[in-house]
């Protein structure tokens, strides 16, 4: 396990670009593989999670070439995948496993999905359950709750499903199964989750219709390959947004960030806390809104974070916790129980680490209460093998009174392989 030591910063200044969006990178490989014709992907995230998806489709007979600039996919069509000869290894990627479960349920072959010890501990019944209602034959540990998952492809029928959770992974898995199902498949969710699948599937030619509170997919449509430009990942930009806000004297420009409205909860929250964030040069690329974001040091105040904004910021909460730890007053987070079933229990992990840094935090079943302090203490932080915990605590270390060490930082490579170098490149000491 590799530890990393962070020293306090005087400011964070400069211009950067963050790697391509992880959610869009996953989907570009999946949808391009089951489309007819060639799909090219520019800006693909070469992190471990998205590469796990890429390798899974290679294992199912898809020719995918990567010259370092562009990923080129020779699509096999909706029914052109081949039975894999070995277990498909999803690594640490919940997106790979859950979306592949939906896509593979309607194939005419057998497949097995597994992953690392963290992924094998995450809940899969939320996907397996509705897929079983569609006629899928899926078995796994703990009655289908845990991976490895064995999938015997079968004939599927469309269903109407009211999801108890707002999860783009659950929604997307059912939508992908719906491509292979007879009739229409309808998914409703309590709050709108990210809509990259809806946007991209429609661009590929799928019969996808959105309505308030849900999405409808009609099976049988052939997808056609296309060119995709992947914007910068706002979940990766989040660490630099928070760093720019909390480190005095900071002025940072992040270029080419995806600002899909289902993903901009982080911007709404940080602005709500008093953060000086400005979206400039707003534009549209491959059906996704994109902007440059300027962030400057700001005095932050506490707020309540709950309701619709939570699924729009679900992956950014570790970084938000760092901002809240330096905000005046007590920030209350509610409706975020989903954080407990991420790569680790992110509520407990951030509470544990920020307490070590001198912050007063009370955990609740679906969130936490964070009382801000004027400064953080350097500490020995535990990443818990979670990339977002590791990066969040490295950002916290920039404003600690002395050095902060973060354990097991190799996990950062799942989503942001160049994070350390990019951060050190803008930190002024």
UniProtKB/Swiss-Prot annotation:
Localisation per UniProt entry: Cytoplasm
Gene Ontology CC annotations of this record: cytoplasm
Listed EC numbers: 2.5.1.19
Keywords: Amino-acid biosynthesis, Aromatic amino acid biosynthesis, Cytoplasm, Transferase
Binding site for phosphoenolpyruvate: 22, 94, 122, 169, 346, 388
GO MF term (any one): 3-phosphoshikimate 1-carboxyvinyltransferase activity
Positions that bind 3-phosphoshikimate: 22-23, 27, 167, 169, 315, 342
Main location: cytoplasm
Source organism, top-level taxon: Bacteria
SUPFAM superfamilies assigned: EPT/RTPC-like (SSF55205)
Disulfide bonds: none
Pathway connected to this protein: Metabolic intermediate biosynthesis; chorismate biosynthesis; chorismate from D-erythrose 4-phosphate and phosphoenolpyruvate: step 6/7
One example of a Gene Ontology biological process annotation: aromatic amino acid family biosynthetic process
PROSITE patterns in alphabetical order: EPSP_SYNTHASE_1 (PS00104), EPSP_SYNTHASE_2 (PS00885)
Active site, per annotation: 315
Reactions that this protein is recorded to catalyse: 3-phosphoshikimate + phosphoenolpyruvate = 5-O-(1-carboxyvinyl)-3-phosphoshikimate + phosphate
Complex and partners: Monomer.
Function description: Catalyzes the transfer of the enolpyruvyl moiety of phosphoenolpyruvate (PEP) to the 5-hydroxyl of shikimate-3-phosphate (S3P) to produce enolpyruvyl shikimate-3-phosphate and inorganic phosphate.
Family classification: Belongs to the EPSP synthase family.
Identification of the protein by name: 3-phosphoshikimate 1-carboxyvinyltransferase
Annotated source species: Citrifermentans bemidjiense (strain ATCC BAA-1014 / DSM 16622 / JCM 12645 / Bem) (Geobacter bemidjiensis)
């Amino acid at each position: 396990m590799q530890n990393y030591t962070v020293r306090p910063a005087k400011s964070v200044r400069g211009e950067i670009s963050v790697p391509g969006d992880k959610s869009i990178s996953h989907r570009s490989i999946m949808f391009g593989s089951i489309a007819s014709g060639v799909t090219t992907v520019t800006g693909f995230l070469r992190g471990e999670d998205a590469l796990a998806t890429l390798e899974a489709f290679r294992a199912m007979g898809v020719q995918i070439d990567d010259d370092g600039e562009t990923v080129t996919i020779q699509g096999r069509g909706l029914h052109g995948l081949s039975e894999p000869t070995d277990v498909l290894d999803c690594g640490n990627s919940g997106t790979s496993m859950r979306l592949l479960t939906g896509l593979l349920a309607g194939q005419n072959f057998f497949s097995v999905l597994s992953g690392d010890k963290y992924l094998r501990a995450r809940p899969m019944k939320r996907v397996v359950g509705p897929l079983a209602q569609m006629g899928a034959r899926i078995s796994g540990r703990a009655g289908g709750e845990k991976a490895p998952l064995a999938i015997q492809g079968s004939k599927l029928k469309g269903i109407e499903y009211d999801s108890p959770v707002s999860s783009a992974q659950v929604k997307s898995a059912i939508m992908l199964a719906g491509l292979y199902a007879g009739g229409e498949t309808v998914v409703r969710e309590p709050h709108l989750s990210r809509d990259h699948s809806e946007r991209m599937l429609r661009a590929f030619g799928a019969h996808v219709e959105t309505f308030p509170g849900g999405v409808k997919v009609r099976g049988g449509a052939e997808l056609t390959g296309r060119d995709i430009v992947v914007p910068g990942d706002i979940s990766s930009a989040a660490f630099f947004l928070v760093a720019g806000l909390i480190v005095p004297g900071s002025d940072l420009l992040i270029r080419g960030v995806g600002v899909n409205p289902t993903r901009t909860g982080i911007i709404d929250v940080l602005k709500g806390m008093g953060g000086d964030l400005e979206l400039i040069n707003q534009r549209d690329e491959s059906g996704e809104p994109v902007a440059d974001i300027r962030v400057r040091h700001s005095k932050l105040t506490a707020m309540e974070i709950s309701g619709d904004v939570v699924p729009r910021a679900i992956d950014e909460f570790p970084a938000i916790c760092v901002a809240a730890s330096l905000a005046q007053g007590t920030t209350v987070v509610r409706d975020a129980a989903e954080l407990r079933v991420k790569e680790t229990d992110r509520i407990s992990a951030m509470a544990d680490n920020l307490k070590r840094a001198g912050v007063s935090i009370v955990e609740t079943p679906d969130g936490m209460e964070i009382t801000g302090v004027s400064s953080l203490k350097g500490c020995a932080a535990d990443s818990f093998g979670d990339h977002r915990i590791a990066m969040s605590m490295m950002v916290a270390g920039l404003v600690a009174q002395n050095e902060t060490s973060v354990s097991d930082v190799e996990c950062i490579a799942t989503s942001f392989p160049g994070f350390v170098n990019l951060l050190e490149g803008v930190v002024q000491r």
